[in-house]
Amino acid sequence: MNPNIQHINTKIAKYKKDVVNHPLYNQLNSIEDVQKLMEIHVYAVWDFMSLLKGLQIELTSTSIPWKPIGDNKIRRLINSIVLEEESDVDSDGNPAPHYEMYLDAMKECGANTTEIEKFVDSVADINLPKVNTAIDSFLATTFDVLKTGEAHKIASAFTFGREDLIPDMFTAIVNLSLIHISEPTRRYS
């Protein structure tokens, strides 16, 4: 591994551990608790897609007329992540973005998707509608990074703040939820 990446991983290890072992996960004792978590976390799912699109804009060609820009390997990596995030295959074999799959999962467990759907519908450029103080602050931090247009900052937020962290975080949530929650989820149809 690149020594610079190792250095960053060492520096952020404590913070990653804090997120993965957050006491909030132990408080997921009912399906209602999971619904509430999802109703808040969905903004991070949307935010993740915004970071990814920021990387795509900075490191690949998204302009008309098209021109090849940047490193071929980086373009391929970014575009393959975009393909996976925007056009993955759901459990029924249909193409669907991860964001929309998350909304479907929210609906399946009875979580409210109205607020995030209104939020996304009303987003214009990078002027974000207000949600609540915590979500607004989280999104403002991301969009401050995106506004810099600096690929290394966007890539750092994407990689170390999302892509590298999310699998461990979800594993912790799922494991604790399986222990604490015995109610079946409702099937959205």
Where are these regions (language model features)?
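Sequence termini and other peripheral, non-core segments
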Residues: M1-I5, K11, N21, E117-S122, ...
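Alpha-helical bundle segments that constitute or directly flank the non-heme di-iron/ferroxidase center
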Residues: N4-V19, N29-P65, E84-V89, V145, ...
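Short, charge- and proline-biased low-complexity linear segments
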Residues: E58-W66, T113-V120
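Short, well-ordered alpha-helical segments
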Residues: G70-R76
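Active-site-proximal alpha-helical scaffolds that flank and shape metal-associated catalytic sites
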Residues: R76-L178
